[in-house]
Each structure stands twice: as C-alpha cells, then as structure tokens.
Amino acid sequence: MRISTQTDIIFPAFGIDEGMKIFKEAGFDALDFSMFYMNSSRESVLGNMGEDELVNKLLESSEKYSLPFNQAHAPFPSYRFGDEEYNKFVYEKLKLSIRIAGKIGASQIIVHPT
C-alpha cells in the first residue's frame, strides 16, 4: 500500500521541487497531482509554464525524490448546468488534465461531475 496526498496546497505555495521535498520528508510514498484550479483564470497548476515544461518539471522532481504520481484530480466542477461558456472552457481543461496525468504516469484521474 502507498500513502499518497494531494499537491493542491503545497505546490502553489512552495513550488514543485520544494513541494516534492516536503512531501518526501513527511513520509509520503506517492502523490495525487491536483489540477483543480484549471477551471478558472487562477490556473496555479500551469502558472507561466506550458504543458511540456510543467510535465518535465514534475517528472524531474518525481525522479529526484522517488515520489511517483499514482493519480491526479481533474478540474472541477467539470460541468455547470446552463453555463455553456464555462462547460466549453472546462471541457478543454479536462482534456488537458487527462493528457498531463498520462504523461506523468498517473494510472487514474479523478473527475468530479459537478
């Protein structure tokens, strides 16, 4: 069994590499990569990085600290009744989050419907 936690608070506050160090020192075996805020203009997951740069940073730190990503969380809510503008926007972010999850080796991604 692996002990895993979400990256939601630590990565935005400390950055990827320092965050990985914190998680490793705390005793975690794996991580759930949080992409919650890709559903708004607060895209703290990507920051100023492009998809490839983000994936490379995640993989480098994952290898450095021997902390794999066992799963990921997609942006949510993934659908809002009656809000087609949001739904079109978040649909593209859902596809992006699934792509990123696959590239970092997460075997599953959690998608909350609403």
Protein language model annotation of sequence segments:
Residues I109-T114:
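Short, intrinsically disordered, charge-balanced linker/junction segments flanking boundaries
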